[in-house]
Amino acid sequence: MSNLTVFVGGSVGKDPRSPKTWSGSCAPFLDALNSAGILNRAVGFAVPRFHNSLLLAKNFNRNRSIWRSHYYFDPAYRNALTRAARRIPVHTLFLLQLGHMFSLPQAFPDKKCISYHDGNLSERLKSGFGLAGLSAKRIDQALRYEEQVANQMTAVFTFSEYLRQSFVGDYHVPANRVFNVGGGINLTEIPPIRPDKTYSAPRILFIGTEFRRKGGPQLLEAFRIVRESIPDAELHIAGPTGLETIPDGVHFHGHLSKADPAQRHKLESLFRDSTLFVLPSLYEPFGIAPLEAMVYQLPCLVTDGWALRETVTPSLTGDLVPKGAVEPLASKIIELLSDPQRLAAMGRRGREHVLGEFTWDAVARRITDTIVSI
């Protein structure tokens, strides 16, 4: 078939396989499309350097986070990125873009254009994360842009049913043009199953670069309560570059990059040696880390919200806790760690669930089937 061109543009420069975007999912996603025989090519692009400098100057703010968001939310930046996309020659009927940063329908009105998303600004606004200090004007401009572009698409693909419903309800895209094709894990190799894995050691694992958004402070509070009942409990934290304090029983491993062999090996060992994965996020559009934990036979305790409800099944592959609630989180951790046999059963079911539903090969098959239908 090979009738699909994938466009990756914006913050990642001109490398469509950059590990710095899309939570590191670009390369495995493109590899799966290629293996499925649907990918013609993937292209990366950026705003020309001089114009980009002008846009950066226009949106300058002493706060780098606000500066970055105002720049990316600026309609002038998104229009410039769309013009950059238009200059790329295409020879396929179907074009797919990752995210909302530009508009393929505007660049190629004679093509069938699709966008693919793990989140959107509407859901981010509801969460309140990452928008402090941004002007209401910029937020409104970006929100309108996303809605406009989504409605121009031949089809919109989402990582989850939760997000599919957001595009239909918040952006008013007709339901028959929004498809939940799922998302996948970003493991270069699937670890072998371990029939002899034991769960007697009370060893908790947390992985998340954005410590506050991922519920790290709430987990630390809950862990203090857990240690009162299980004094030898351990909490291993990877992802953030630093912690203000490291309480007793907490093992801090810093940021671990899969691109670095030694750090990837350390990350793999944390997955192998832990008995429970906990991610009490305050906002989590999708959540790849819990899926990867389940491949390592780790039951997952996550927030009862967003797409996490679709990936973790209570009492079967893990459990759900209310957002931001410390005591229920602590109680559930104690309950799970106190029942190693239950953890083992959850771990087996979780691995089967992820390998059956949440691989990029499975996503590529769904995309192929959907494209044929449109």
Which stretches of residues belong to each language-model region?
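Conserved acidic donor-binding segment of nucleotide-sugar-dependent glycosyltransferases
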Residues: P314-S315, D319-V326, E335-P340
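Short hydrophobic beta-strand element within catalytic cores of glycosyltransferases
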Residues: P299-T303, V312
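Nucleotide-activated donor-binding/catalytic signature segment of Leloir-type glycosyltransferases, i.e.
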Residues: G239-L276
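Conserved donor-binding/catalytic core segment of Leloir-type glycosyltransferases
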Residues: D196-K214, L220-R227, L235
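A short, well-ordered alpha-helix in the C-terminal region of glycosyltransferases
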Residues: P328, E335, R342-E357, R366-D369
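Aromatic "clamp/platform" in nucleotide-sugar-dependent glycosyltransferases that forms part
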Residues: L282
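Membrane-proximal helix-turn-helix segments that form the acceptor-binding/catalytic region
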Residues: S135-V156
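Carbohydrate-associated surface elements
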Residues: Y162, G184
